[in-house]
């Protein structure tokens, strides 16, 4: 049967229904704030007789069944109900609708009041109490305090009985200083109090740490967490300045704090209020907390119980994640720890409820206080006194890959940082001449690859290490010793001490981050997704913390491994490895601006202050070498059309022979049966597409902005895509040029379909058929730019791009009457270009500001070329998204469009509807896009999100009827990343609930989801599983890494050659990813079910949301996309189709096969001299990039077979045979050159590549020895 009406569900449902068990009463008071409930209960307890009262937390009434039960047993018997929903109606709509309906039916009164001190018109429809009465009731809460709690009860009773109404609310200070035992006091009283509690030291004024918390805690007397923080700070010799506010958006509160801070300026602020003053994506509103330049630490008074926190790998519930983590990041706060938890202290029989209070946890309080004190100490110290450690990542763990940092010339950036520090007065010593000199110096000492026969500059003795190790929690010690044995067994333990990869430059030390441990035993990748780090890793950070005495640590560039160590996702405990190893140290982390997810991981698990930096410069691929020759031949062929047929045949044969010779036929999609004309048409379109691809042109150097052509090309890349509403100066520059040049028709946009009215179509250079013959106008301003033929729409696009670059650089003047283009150029000159040019200085300013213990301004994150110029200038402490708003309506539109194109492509390729896809969802990508991946998954199964249109938050889902869908539903298995699991628990629940709801009574052919769930449930029941559990397990469609672990397992196996066959790679992927997630499921081991899902998938789907990188830039793509393919092939007996989709332009998603995408990237970027020349500007790190690219090619070949012989051949010719490039690598990074040759040799030995030259293997085998000899000679 078909579902004719849309069905709906919510994601706000509680995990389970709760029966509060309350008997009826005259008055019910429901609130989301436990402090209010406590205050009202206390006021009621002071009374004898009178009306009966029941109180309840709204958080206990999130599940619809809980609401129904409460209304039936308790609420419908009341005479008055007062509700205070925090956050508006959207979170509690089901409850409010049910209560209002009951009030109308049973004729009692209901007053729904705002949960804070801001009016909320959206609540008015749920009330029956008159507006003036609601205002009076609300005032008792906005003023607060025990007296007003009593007056509220009096007023509520008056509404029920008709008695005289009491006096209005008594005013209570909105903000002020509060002190234990003294109450609300002034600045002078505070100064006297703290002076008497501090041990006097001549000439020393102790630091001041502000503690900002909600006024509601003073009102209710729930101040124990504040008192605990005061005690912990004082124990460290620091003055605590506890200040309360009604809200950081309240003008009176802000003014009061400004006055207090003007007399008693804090060095650091610890903030316990939730939410943010600014809104994500809006202009920043500075807060009073950082007005003195103080860094602001976010401490959390959690809404969860201590038991929930201790047992949860997530650490915090979704509501805490949004209110106390994600939104405070928008204001630039540094996440410290959850320092208190909710505890039911007593059961109050009069109100039939547990009175819940805040219970501080000593260890968490102490850690947060230590972090605050350490920030204060950094701020108080003079630059010359500060001891700073700078750590560079190193993976793979080889000498050719030191200083890993995505998109970053990490060594050169580190030298820039050292130089800037020296100018600021830091005791830096002699700064290396450049990045290559720094690397040579570090490589003379121990590295992850080798320690023997190296200069050991820094070491930590066994006794000193044992002192550190013994101070760790027992669980940590047991796990490390259990896995790695005694410290002396560590491979970096030499002659009684650990040899450390560190080098001092005055009071600054630069080091190479140790390996996680997989390099010691690569096969451990199979079995240990949560592998604990070895002794050598702990020894490195022990030395920095204790022997060196680092006051702050810098991790240079995306990304290291510290933030990915085992432990909770949020609100870490002492047994979480990032905390145990790193401790409460100030942490500065330069990080690429377009990767909010992985940077956010560092913010949330290591309290990092991000200093975001630019992407690498971007440019057009253009044509080169054999591709340019082909292009000229194709132009010659079409110019000769209509002439001598024999010459045409000769030209076509010459062209197609060359195409086949270099393997371009398969990349261009030329089939064996294609006619010459069809083959040439495909080739022409392909060459045009390659030319216009966006590629990287070198790397970014931290603190240095691009100049000259690099600045021009990056500016053009940012201006290519419309920004904002795409109007005026925010239009696409290329579209503006096309419009002003009068280019119309002659190339139908691919998204428009076959519209014959060509002349009526405005020409769109971003969406056209490149190989279409151009018969339109050829204005001289475009024609004069190039002597190349102007034959196709692609030639038109090329000229538009050339003109755009000339206009942006100022080499050509824009015609006065080109209004559209002039508007865009005005925006470029006033905003876009300056934001790029200012980024270098802003990055260094942000870095030095953070290093001086001062507040670093926050800013948004994302891909600048995806219409996000607001992320520039860089140099800010970026934030991500409000996870409650994911997926956004715009993301759903893109996801839906991409889903339909994907299904259409599969139908075209295979001749039948798809039934099952496997899709990867990454936290970073979904932060950048607002949820494209999860939106696409929902669209594929035939569901869509529902939103509260006021707050724009996702409230639930709606099942799309088959009649509307117009196709069968596609069963989707999600393999989520560890960070997606941590950051998007609500989205996991959304998809989980939606796919279960989709299991409708529809025909199997139309709904394989339902068919498979029914069949699997029956199978599980036959095996003895209870029906409910069988149904639940059969519904699992979201899988990820083990709780507390991250990744997909393949990197270490590939890097360390720890595999024999593809089955080994499949096994690792399955072992690491076989944990089921969903509503109420936090990672249940379900290997058999994960295998069953992958066995039946027909296609692997991977989306790429920007072109600032490609799939051969990172190990993530091959690990997830390739890993899923390898596992599915191993289980199902054949390799599924693999689609790698381009979402870089949201209005025009493009579906490509993995083979197509790899071919494009190899041709346009990997072997393109323009890219090679760009990385060669960066010496050692440039050679690193070349070797890394070949690694990723190899890994895709190993996992998917999608890399062809001619791709390897092209790389071999470009990097080995080309003497210019080979000499560069031998000179700048001989280790990387040897690693590259070794990887190509491995490709031959594993039958992944058959070279054309018989001598290739011999040549490659000799390079490693020669490179080693050369390096030894240089040393």
Curated annotation (Swiss-Prot):
- Its pathway? Cofactor biosynthesis; adenosylcobalamin biosynthesis; cob(II)yrinate a,c-diamide from precorrin-2 (aerobic route): step 10/10
| Biological process annotations from GO | cobalamin biosynthetic process; porphyrin-containing compound biosynthetic process
Q: Can the keyword Glycosyltransferase be found in this entry's annotation? A: no
List cellular component terms (GO): cytoplasm
Q: Which UniProt keywords apply?
A: ATP-binding, Cobalamin biosynthesis, Cytoplasm, Ligase, Nucleotide-binding, Porphyrin biosynthesis
**Primary localization:** cytoplasm
Q: Where in the cell is it found?
A: Cytoplasm
- Give a GO molecular function annotation for the protein: cobaltochelatase activity
What EC numbers are recorded for this enzyme? Answer: 6.6.1.2
Q: Which residues form the signal peptide?
A: none
Superkingdom of the source species: Bacteria
Q: Which reaction does it catalyse?
A: hydrogenobyrinate a,c-diamide + Co(2+) + ATP + H2O = cob(II)yrinate a,c diamide + ADP + phosphate + 5 H(+)
Q: Which PANTHER family match?
A: AEROBIC COBALTOCHELATASE SUBUNIT COBN, MAGNESIUM-CHELATASE SUBUNIT CHLH, CHLOROPLASTIC
Similarity comment: family membership:
Belongs to the CobN family.
UniProt-listed NCBIfam families:
cobalto_cobN (TIGR02257)
Relate the protein's function as given in its record.
Catalyzes cobalt insertion in the corrin ring.
Instruction: State whether it acts alone or in a complex, and with which partners, per the record.
Output: Heterotrimer of CobN, CobS and CobT.
* Protein name stated in the entry: Aerobic cobaltochelatase subunit CobN
């Amino acid at each position: 049967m078909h579902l004719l009406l849309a069905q709906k569900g919510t994601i706000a449902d509680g995990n389970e229904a709760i029966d509060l068990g309350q008997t009826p009463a005259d008055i019910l008071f429901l609130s989301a704030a436990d402090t209010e409930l406590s205050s009202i209960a206390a006021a009621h307890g002071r009374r004898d007789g009178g009306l009966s009262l029941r109180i309840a937390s709204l958080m206990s009434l999130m599940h619809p069944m809980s609401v129904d039960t409460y209304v039936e047993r308790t609420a419908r018997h009341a005479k008055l109900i007062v509700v205070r929903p925090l956050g508006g109606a959207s979170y509690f709509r089901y409850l409010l609708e049910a209560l209002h309906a009951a009030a109308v039916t049973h004729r009692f009164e209901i007053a729904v009041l705002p949960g804070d001190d801001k009016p909320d018109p959206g609540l008015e429809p749920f009330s029956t109490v008159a507006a003036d009465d609601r205002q009076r009731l609300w005032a008792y809460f906005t003023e607060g305090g025990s007296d007003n709690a009593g007056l509220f009860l009096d007023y509520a009773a008056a509404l029920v009985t008709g008695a005289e109404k009491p006096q209005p609310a008594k005013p209570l200070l909105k903000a002020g200083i509060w002190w234990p035992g003294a109450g609300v006091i002034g600045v002078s009283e505070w100064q006297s109090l703290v002076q008497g509690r501090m041990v006097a030291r001549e000439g020393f004024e102790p630091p001041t740490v502000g503690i900002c918390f909600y006024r509601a805690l003073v009102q209710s007397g729930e101040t124990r967490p504040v008192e605990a923080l005061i005690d912990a700070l004082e124990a460290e010799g620091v003055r605590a300045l506890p200040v309360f506010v009604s809200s950081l958006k309240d003008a009176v509160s802000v003014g009061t704090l400004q006055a207090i801070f003007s007399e008693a300026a804090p060095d650091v602020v610890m903030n316990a209020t939730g939410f943010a003053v600014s809104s994500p994506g809006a202009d920043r509103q500075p807060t009073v907390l950082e007005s003195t330049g103080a860094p602001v630490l976010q401490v959390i008074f959690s809404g969860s119980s201590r038991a929930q926190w201790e047992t949860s790998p997530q650490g915090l519930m979704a509501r805490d994640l949004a209110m106390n983590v994600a939104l405070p990041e928008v204001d630039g706060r540094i996440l410290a720890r959850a320092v208190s938890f909710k505890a039911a202290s007593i059961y109050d029989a009069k109100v039939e409820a547990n009175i819940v209070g805040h219970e501080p946890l000593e260890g968490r309080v102490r850690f947060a206080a230590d972090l605050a004190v350490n920030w204060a100490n950094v701020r108080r110290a003079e630059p010359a006194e500060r001891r700073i450690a700078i750590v560079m990542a190193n993976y793979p763990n080889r000498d050719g890959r030191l200083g890993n940092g995505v998109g970053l010339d990490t060594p050169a950036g580190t030298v820039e940082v050292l130089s800037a520090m020296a100018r600021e007065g830091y005791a830096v010593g002699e700064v290396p001449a450049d990045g290559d000199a720094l690397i040579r110096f570090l490589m003379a000492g121990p590295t992850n690859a080798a320690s023997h026969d190296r200069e050991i500059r820094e070491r930590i003795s066994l006794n000193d290490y044992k002192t550190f190790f013994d101070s760790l929690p027992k669980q940590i010690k047991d796990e490390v010793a259990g896995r790695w044995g005694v410290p002396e067994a560590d491979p970096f333990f030499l002659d009684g001490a650990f040899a450390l990869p560190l080098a001092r430059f005055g009071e600054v030390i630069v080091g190479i981050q140790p390996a996680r441990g997989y390099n010691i035993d690569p096969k451990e990748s199979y079995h240990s997704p949560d592998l604990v780090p070895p002794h050598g890793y702990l020894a490195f950070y022990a030395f920095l913390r204790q022997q060196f005495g680092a006051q702050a640590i810098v991790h240079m560039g995306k990304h290291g491994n510290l933030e990915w160590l085992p432990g909770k996702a949020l609100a870490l405990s002492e047994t979480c490895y990032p905390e145990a190893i790193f401790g409460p140290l100030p942490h500065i982390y330069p990080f690429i601006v377009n990767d909010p997810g992985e940077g956010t991981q560092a913010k949330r698990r290591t309290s990092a202050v991000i200093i975001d930096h630019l992407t690498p410069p971007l440019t057009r691929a253009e044509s080169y070498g054999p591709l340019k020759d082909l292009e000229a031949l194709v132009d010659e062929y079409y110019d000769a059309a209509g002439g001598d047929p024999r010459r045409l045949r000769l030209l076509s044969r010459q062209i197609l022979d060359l195409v086949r010779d270099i393997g371009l036929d398969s990349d261009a999609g030329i089939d064996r049966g294609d006619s010459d004309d069809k083959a040439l048409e495909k080739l022409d379109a392909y060459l045009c597409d390659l030319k216009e691809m966006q590629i990287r042109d070198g790397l970014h150097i931290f603190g240095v902005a691009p100049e000259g052509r690099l600045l021009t090309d990056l500016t053009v890349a940012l201006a290519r895509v419309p920004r904002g509403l795409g109007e005026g100066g925010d239009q696409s520059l290329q579209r503006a040029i096309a419009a002003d040049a009068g280019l119309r028709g002659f190339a139908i946009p691919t998204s428009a379909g076959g519209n014959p009215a060509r002349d009526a179509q405005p020409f769109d250079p971003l969406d056209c058929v490149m190989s279409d013959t151009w018969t339109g106008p050829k204005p001289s301003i475009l024609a004069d730019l190039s002597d190349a033929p102007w034959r196709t729409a692609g030639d038109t696009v090329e000229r538009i791009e050339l003109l755009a670059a000339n206009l942006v650089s100022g080499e050509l003047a824009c015609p006065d009457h080109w209004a559209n283009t002039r508007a865009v150029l005005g925006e470029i000159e006033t905003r876009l270009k300056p934001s790029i040019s200012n980024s270098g200085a802003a990055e260094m300013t942000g870095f030095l500001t953070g290093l001086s213990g001062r507040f670093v301004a926050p800013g948004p994150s994302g891909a600048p070329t995806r219409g996000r110029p607001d992320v520039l200038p860089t140099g800010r402490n970026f934030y991500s998204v409000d996870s409650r708003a994911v997926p956004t309506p715009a993301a759903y539109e893109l996801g839906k469009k991409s889903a339909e194109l994907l299904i259409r492509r599969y139908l075209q390729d295979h001749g039948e509807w798809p039934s099952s896809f496997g899709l990867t969802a990454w936290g970073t990508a979904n932060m950048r896009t607002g949820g494209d991946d999860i939106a696409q998954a929902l669209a594929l199964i035939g569901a869509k999100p529902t939103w509260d249109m006021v707050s724009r938050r996702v409230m639930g889902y709606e099942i799309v009827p088959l009649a509307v869908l117009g196709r069968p539903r596609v069963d989707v298995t999600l393999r989520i990343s560890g960070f997606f699991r941590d950051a998007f628990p609500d989205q996991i629940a959304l998809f989980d609930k939606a796919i279960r709801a989709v299991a409708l009574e529809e025909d199997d052919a139309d709904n394989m989801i339902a068919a498979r769930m029914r069949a699997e449930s029956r199978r599980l029941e036959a095996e003895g599983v209870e029906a409910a559990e069988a149904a639940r397990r059969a519904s699992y469609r979201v899988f990820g890494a083990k709780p507390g672990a991250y990744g997909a397992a393949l990197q270490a196996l590939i890097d360390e050659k720890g595999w024999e066959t593809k089955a080994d790679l499949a096994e690792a992927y399955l072992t690491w990813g076989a944990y089921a997630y969903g509503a109420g499921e936090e990672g249940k081991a379900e290997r058999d079910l994960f295998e069953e899902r992958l066995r039946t998938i027909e296609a692997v789907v991977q989306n790429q949301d920007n072109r600032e990188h490609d799939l051969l830039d990172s190990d993530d793509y091959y690990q997830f996309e390739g890993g899923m393919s390898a596992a599915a092939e191993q289980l199902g007996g054949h390799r599924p189709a693999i689609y790698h989709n381009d979402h870089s332009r949201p209005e025009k998603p493009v579906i490509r096969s993995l083979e197509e995408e790899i071919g494009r990237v190899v041709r346009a970027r990997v072997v393109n001299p323009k890219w090679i020349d760009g990385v060669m500007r960066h010496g050692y790190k440039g050679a690193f990039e070349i070797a890394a690219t070949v690694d990723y090619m190899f890994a895709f070949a190993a996992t998917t077979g999608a890399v062809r012989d001619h791709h390897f051949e092209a790389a071999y010719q470009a990097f080995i045979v080309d003497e210019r490039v080979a000499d560069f690598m031998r000179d700048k990074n001989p280790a990387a050159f040897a690693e590259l040759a070794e990887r190509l040799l491995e490709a031959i030995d594993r039958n992944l590549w058959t070279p054309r030259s018989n001598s290739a293997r011999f040549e490659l085998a000799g390079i490693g020895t020669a490179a080693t000899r050369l390096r030894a000679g240089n040393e």
